[in-house]
Amino acid sequence: MAPHKHKRTLNIYFDTDYTIIGVDGSLRPGARKLFNNLIQSGDHIFIWSGNGIRWKDLDRHKLSHFVTECLEKPLANFQSATEGIPKNSKPDLVIDDNLEIVAALGGVWVNRYYFPNLEDNELDIVGEIIEEVKSKGISLNPRYRKTPIF
């Protein structure tokens, strides 16, 4: 039996610090390419941070035009904290260096990004996992956590 195609538009929530932006404010390699690919395939990018709304960082890196909305990220009680998000904007996948929020909401855990490193390919891996989830409904990559049903 052929695998069922799950291609659909996703709301993808990216953390900022240590996920797409380093300690020194540098942009993680592959961020612009990944954001462009996600937008081209119809997905919606949300940026959230436990350190407030981050439009200034997105503007500095010329990423604002990719982003649907910036939000304050909850730091605890992740499921109940996201209940106030409108249904059509709820996270389908969370991309974060904090495994706890990824496990609670579903998504992809990434290694922390601190300083410029041209060898860093974390966001290439994230892109591959997202494509796998979109086409198969799941990824077998150990960094992926299925969205819990609640």
Regions found by a protein language model. Name each.
Residues A2-S80, I149:
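Alpha-helical substrate-recognition element adjacent to the catalytic core
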